[in-house]
């Protein structure tokens, strides 16, 4: 079996080492590598990846973009995929984020930094967990407003949107904070 992780940048990913060791220890005949795809080359490159790999993980900045290229198994408004196998797209981010929190009380409001696929997964879990108030910060307000609109239409909770510059003010009143952005990743800001 041939597997990989796609994203940009992706050279910092520990996934190839982790999965390589796991496959070795479990006696699984599989390989796992990192494939860096430039955002401008995504449409051409994703076809090649789908043809040459049995499955792949998806990281920034492609978790939302990949949906148009696979058979999506995610329910709206999650609209982000982090795993593709046999050309079917799945999202395990929300479970990975939420499982450790199931036994705990989540204090509100929850501040989320970022408005990409990871933020969608966090909001998806928080909504299922009964959280009523989310404060969403992003550098591009239109992306945050889109998420607000898509999730609030389902009812049961409120998302307030703030520019990234409001981070200190919003953090001062937030009881829980989640960084779902690329900020701090590998010591770089990625967009």
Segment roles from a protein language model:
Residues 1-104:
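Phosphate/diphosphate ligand-binding glycine-rich loop within oxidoreductases
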Residues 146-157:
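Short, conserved SAM-binding/catalytic segment
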Residues 7, 93-94, 101, 107-131, ...:
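Glycine-rich adenosine-cofactor-binding loop
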Residues 157-191:
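Rossmann-like adenosine-cofactor binding region
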Residues 54, 132, 157:
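Short acidic/polar active-site loop segments enriched in Thr and Asp
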Residues 33, 134-135:
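Conserved beta-strand positions in the Rossmann-like core of class I SAM-dependent methyltransferases
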